[in-house]
């Protein structure tokens, strides 16, 4: 194990020695200039770990119940689909990725990665109220997930 680049990683590692979080959710923006399909939608990146994709789909059903309408079932990228092909799936098992690393730390917890657009969802320009509404949707989905699991 090498020296961590970011202080946040040390803090998370210290936390996992005391607490056992039930979930890791990596939320970040997709690359700019990629295909519109991926650049302007909210989606989960399908994981290859045994049972992970089924868990992600279950979480997706909870998030899709949100009121913002920003996340839609069917927008997720399944393992093996498009750019999430064999090279990406191999990388998902890599402990240098957030989800790969988390599975080495707490393999029994739920892990997922979300790509969210920078400013536009489909043809809609997003503003502060949209982001707050999406945050409420995510919070409600997490709560429902934790209650159920």
Where are these regions (language model features)?
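Short glycine/proline-enriched loop/turn "hinge" motifs that connect secondary-structure elements
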Residues: 102-108
């Amino acid at each position: 194990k090498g020296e961590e680049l970011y202080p946040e990683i040390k803090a998370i590692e210290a936390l996992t020695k005391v607490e056992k979080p039930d979930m890791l959710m990596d939320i970040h923006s997709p690359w700019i200039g990629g295909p519109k399909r991926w650049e302007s939608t909210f989606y989960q990146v399908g994981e290859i770990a045994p049972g992970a994709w089924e868990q992600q789909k279950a979480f997706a059903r909870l998030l899709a119940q949100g009121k913002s309408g920003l996340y839609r079932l069917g927008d997720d990228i399944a393992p093996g689909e498009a750019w999430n092909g064999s090279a990406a799936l191999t990388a998902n098992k890599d402990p240098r990725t957030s989800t790969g690393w988390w599975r080495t730390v707490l393999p029994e917890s739920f892990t997922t990665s979300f790509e969210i657009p920078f400013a536009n969802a489909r043809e809609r320009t997003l503003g502060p109220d949209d982001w707050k509404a999406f945050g409420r949707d995510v919070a409600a989905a997490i709560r429902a997930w934790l209650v159920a699991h």
